[in-house]
């Protein structure tokens, strides 16, 4: 696993890097995330996933400050993070990106880690990167659930990873062209890992900082979602 470094992404590479951010009812949290990323010179694909609050208004307001950096796509209804990411992946191809990153909209990821997850791609050591959260800092319920999902990802997809449910990942354009994401909901995290493994895409794991708040702890993969993912994995194993 790649440790922390002082690597800096060149401005030319920043201009060719697109950060996909799916957002659902994040009006109170998303603004500082996208402003910080835009200030760093990265491009941003925002997918408003049918939010019922003022998320879309916030996105449009920030877009006015960074019209050359921010691009907004919207679902009329909430379709889930998996389909929101599919929309983001389809949209980003229009801009001919060199690198693509995915982070969450709620501020649980440190934008300072963008350069760290990009470093293996720019250095040519990998075509995909998985951001790994610290298990010791993770709330116990999430720690247990994530550990179980790591085991299931290994059993059903044959891949050993330290954090199968992370929402912070990156890949090259060539890697994106090779994978096919069809998952709905949070299964996208495991499906992403399955796709890079099935397509022999070299990947690295990079440690990332995670900022836990009551709001971020309440989101993500819970027991009910985990059971749904398990049955989907079984179906893939038997019929794909």
Model segments located where?
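Hydrophobic helical membrane-anchoring modules
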Residues: 1-16, 156-158, 182-240
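Short, well-formed alpha-helical segments that are part of the catalytic scaffolds
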Residues: 4-8, 24-39
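Hydrophobic targeting segments
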Residues: 15-21, 30, 36-37, 43-47
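Short beta-strand/loop segment that forms part of the nucleotide-sugar
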Residues: 21, 42-51, 73-75, 103-105
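Acidic helix N-cap motif at the loop->helix transition within catalytic regions
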Residues: 28-32, 53-62
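Conserved donor nucleotide-binding strand/loop of the catalytic core
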Residues: 45, 56-95
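Acceptor/aglycone-binding surface of glycosyltransferases and processive sugar-polymer synthases
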Residues: 75-94, 111-186, 212-230, 234
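Short beta-strand-to-loop acidic/aromatic patch adjacent to the donor-nucleotide binding site
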Residues: 97-108
């Amino acid at each position: 696993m790649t440790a922390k470094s002082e690597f800096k992404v060149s401005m030319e590479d920043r201009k060719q890097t697109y950060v996909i951010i799916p957002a659902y009812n994040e009006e109170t949290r998303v603004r500082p995330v996208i402003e910080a990323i835009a200030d760093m010179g990265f491009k941003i694909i925002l997918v408003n996933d049918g939010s019922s609050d003022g998320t879309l208004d916030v996105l449009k307001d920030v877009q006015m400050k960074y019209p050359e950096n921010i691009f907004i796509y919207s679902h009329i209804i909430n379709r889930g993070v998996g389909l929101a990411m599919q929309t983001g992946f389809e949209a980003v191809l229009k801009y001919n990106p060199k690198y693509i990153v995915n982070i969450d909209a709620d501020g649980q990821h440190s934008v300072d880690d963008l350069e760290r997850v990009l470093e293996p791609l720019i250095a040519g050591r990998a075509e995909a990167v998985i951001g790994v959260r610290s298990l010791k800092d993770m709330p116990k319920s999430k720690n247990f659930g994530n550990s179980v999902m790591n085991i299931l990802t290994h059993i059903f997809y044959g891949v050993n990873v330290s954090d199968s449910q992370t929402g912070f990942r990156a890949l090259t354009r060539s890697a994106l062209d090779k994978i096919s994401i069809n998952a709905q909901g949070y299964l996208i995290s495991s499906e992403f890992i399955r796709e890079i493994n099935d397509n022999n895409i070299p990947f690295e794991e990079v440690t990332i900082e995670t900022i836990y708040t009551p709001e971020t702890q309440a989101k993500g993969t819970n027991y009910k979602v985990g059971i749904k993912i398990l049955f989907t994995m079984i179906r893939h194993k038997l019929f794909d």
